[in-house]
A protein has these predicted regions:
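Surface-exposed, charge/polar-rich loops and edge strands
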Residues: 12
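Solvent-exposed, non-transmembrane regions of membrane-associated and secreted proteins
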Residues: 17-184
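Short, small-residue-biased leader/transition segments that mark boundaries at the very start
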Residues: 2-9
Length: 184
């Protein structure tokens, strides 16, 4: 009969310690990697979401009949005229009804998009400046004119700069007098 040596629990402790240390280091590495990649991944995801909103907007606007298209712009012109008649539009805009219906062809709040070629920015513009929306897109500042042109109108568009999760207007400081942008 042969006797095989048995391992004592004290012999296994260094192996267990090594595994625990390895798991802790792996966890720290994964947390660090996640923190490092978050801005890039989040910006990429927001870019996809923004592009999808713009494509959906374009598709719906192109499918509008000329009559519906005219009606949407006439309502925005009417809103702008009513806004111009107010003494303090930025504080009295609530007196005008139908803000959320203006230029809202898809019913999702997108009223257009801004394209700034010089800094490679193309962002959807939504009604209002709700903080959760401004984390991934531009907002039309309520109380300013809708961006449809016209004498005496002044549209104000807002977006964040310097968010780690989305580029948005981060590079706006690279624009110079004379640079152009398009609102569609």
């Amino acid at each position: 009969l042969h006797s095989f040596p048995t391992r004592r629990s004290s012999d296994l402790e260094p192996v267990r310690k090594h595994k625990v240390i390895t798991l802790i280091l792996l966890g720290v590495f994964l947390v660090g990697l996640s923190l490092l990649l978050y801005p890039s991944v989040s910006n990429y995801w927001n870019s996809i979401t923004q592009s999808r909103a713009i494509v959906d907007y374009d598709t719906i606007v192109k499918s509008l009949s000329p009559k519906d298209n005219t009606a949407y712009f006439e309502r925005a012109e009417e809103y702008n005229s009513e806004l111009k008649a107010l003494s303090f539009p930025l504080t009295e805009y609530q007196q005008i009804s139908g803000y959320d219906d203006c230029l809202n062809a898809a019913g999702d709040g997108v009223i257009g998009y801004i394209d700034i070629d010089k800094i490679q920015v193309k962002l959807p513009i939504y009604h209002g400046t709700d903080p959760s929306m401004l984390n991934h897109a531009c907002g039309h500042i309520q109380g300013s004119s809708f961006p449809i042109a016209g004498k005496g109108t002044h549209a104000a568009i807002s977006a964040h700069r310097g968010l780690p999760s989305a580029k948005l207007f981060t590079n706006l400081d690279q624009l110079e007098v004379g640079d152009t942008f398009t609102i569609t």
